[in-house]
Amino acid sequence: VQVSGPSGVCLGAAEFDRCIGFEDIPTAGAFTVFDHSRDMFEVARNYVHFFQHESCGFCTPCRVGTSLLKHLMDKLHQGCGSPYDFAEIEKLNQLLQTMSHCGLGHTACNPVLDTIARFRPAYE
């Protein structure tokens, strides 16, 4: 379940007992439910493409960071990824969270990091 749209939190079935609310999982009211037929890597990749397209370009970290993230996800999609790429995604997340001007940049890595943490086999 994707809570609060692409920039929110992606939950696996094991987490369905968590509370929706500011004390645990804050939400803007949007929920997307995926069944087993959906490839969670492709879901995250689609969200990354969306963030890259929607970046206004005002700040360099977001403009370049979302493009680099899109490139890394496309590289993984083509089967050319390596463990180094996962480390790069972590570095991009730190950069985007600390240096981006707005929320889009701050949360652009969320779908990737959440799906890596909860649906790792989708990346292999």
Residue ranges and their predicted role:
Residues 1-124:
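Redox cofactor-anchoring modules in respiratory/redox and cofactor-processing assemblies
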